[in-house]
């Protein structure tokens, strides 16, 4: 036996805030408030307050592994609660305020959360959530000041009898719970672990992934209730980057003002967010000189939108991932030449990919072919909350995406297997049609779904949201597909929508579109 060993240093998430408080104590966390003011604290103060949250939860009899739900936007108070819950070994179950009370009530019934921490502006919704849930033991506590007699977390912080309950537990314990968006079916719970989130954070910080350093000012527009804001509230304190939290407002005007005022250098979110920002900048002749890079994921970005952003000297960094991956799987490296916006870069270290056939068998050739994308890694889901084994025995998880891996290892997401349209026994890939149509200057957003057809089984239906000032005919829109896709792929009909329906994630809500138009 070789003498000597490395220390047993548990990879738990409280260590990121410990590190920030010790080595980057003055780096700022800035938060937009509903009243138009801006809250500012530093990592030293965030660390102090998060530890007090842990102590308060301990006095409320929250134990290791207990679920505590949050109903809040990206704010300072939410980050404090988030770290306070995870820092004492409890599980932070983040809820999406854009869902209905019934949907959220079902979720806290599933998780059996014993406390719901809600932003002051969301207390009415929170009461409805608890009232509609089968969870009869969930206690409501407000984040921030309240005007009624509702319990407030602020009143529970720093009581003399409290002892700090912080860290000192096993890295394999669960840290968080996020439910998938449910845009194509019932939401499923994904349980994160401290070890998985810690390793995911190290993956994010690689030079060829986010390349975030203490010199950056980072604004995650993606909410904390979507896969932990893609892990950025862990990554920023880990390196001492200034963290800018936009609160509830993600409209173009609000984001432009916040980016300018706080000199944001990196902003992160789904394509619809950046569409709104570009429209606002164009309409008002505004420039954002501090903004160097936009990271995009969650849904495909059109070539037209990518071009609009890059014409302003802002780099677009495309990524691919999903809730089940914590969420990042691949990323184009910062500074890479602009390519097809569907290109999502290479997998980061700790992520393994493979392509399979329809039956799940690995393809003999893994380059320059299309297949079903499977993934495994330290931050990849093994099974959904309350369900049996999901991944294969050797750890492979079926993402549901179709992909092509190029010769150089970059990944091109070509569609979703559940979105494929079967017409006359042959498959049509809606993503290829959407890519062509969304690149047109007249189109703001587009979606293609399968519609029932008595002869062919299904036929593609094109739905578009046009940009203001444009009125192309159906024939003009469909003519753009000639020679770009097979002739029998061209949709038979075009439906114009005043506004494309979006899921709470900011993605196009194809489930709603199918429900409304599939049999029309």
Question: For the regions a protein language model found, what residue spans apply to each?
Answer:
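Conserved ATP/PPi-binding loop(s) of AMP-dependent carboxylate-activating enzymes
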Residues: 330, 346-350, 361-394, 426-428
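Conserved adenylate-forming
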Residues: 57-62, 161-172, 177-219, 231, ...
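AMP-binding/adenylate-forming catalytic core of the ANL superfamily
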Residues: 99, 116-118, 257, 377, ...
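Structural core segment of the AMP-binding/adenylate-forming
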Residues: 18, 59-60, 87-155, 165, ...
